[in-house]
């Protein structure tokens, strides 16, 4: 099973620190942002410690294509404001070039919200934006991996058919999909009671062959709520059994599965505890840990 989590590449260790954090969770894949997801500051390529990072990946048998990049979620490729849309396009072009520089293959992108536009017009803007990004990065083996969204507000791409339209309109091997379990559940796909039905819809519209990454998250919300609130594995409305089923599904065996579940806090709200080591162990074993929360807090 390929399974890992979001990790940090901040501080002096940079990419080396990201690999070390992933290893501390017994992960064999991981996801990073090139910088803080809420701003545009990025450190120079020369400071990222790329040679050491690549050596560490080889040493621990982590394939470089299983290092996933996530673009900042503040960018919006769907909007009508041309200046803001162009800013998002230009920023993602830089992110794609940085992704290529570190040897990664997949960058996950939130497609965007249509805001004042209709959904159909928002999709037109996304298609236009993605074509511009591809045109500006020829020859780079980096795949733009569009995330399935929950449909919060005016978010696009909460329905598989919307992603199908984008894929068919652009018709490029560099446009693929990131399947998010929380988002799809919140948008109305019933993984719990209609697992094979969801798989069938996925395959008939997007095509399983077009999935490149899976975000494995439980959901704090009810089916079809269109709210997007992640929960720890087994602590939400999707539940451990269904999420483990996805992780162990042979149809997804080749795909990196990335946890984006929330950190836990102590009673003061100040100290935080990453849940990933315990959640990864639980999913690998395919056995629910009744003491999950205590084990996370006590790092057992």
What are these regions (language model features)?
Residues 1-69, 75-97, 285-300:
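N-terminal pre-domain/capping segments
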Residues 6-10, 35-37, 72-74, 112-114, ...:
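Active-site beta-loop-alpha junctions enriched in small/polar residues
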Residues 10, 258-275, 300:
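A short, acidic, flexible beta-alpha connecting loop/helix-capping segment that sits on the rim
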Residues 19-26, 46-68, 94-103, 134-139, ...:
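Acidic (Asp/Glu)-rich catalytic clusters
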Residues 22, 70, 88, 99, ...:
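Conserved, mostly hydrophobic/aromatic
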Residues 58, 77-176:
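Active-site acidic/histidine proton-transfer and metal-coordination neighborhood
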Residues 81-94, 119-132, 159-168, 195-200, ...:
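Short, electropositive alpha-helical surface patch
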Residues 128-232:
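Acidic/histidine-rich catalytic cores of soluble enzymes
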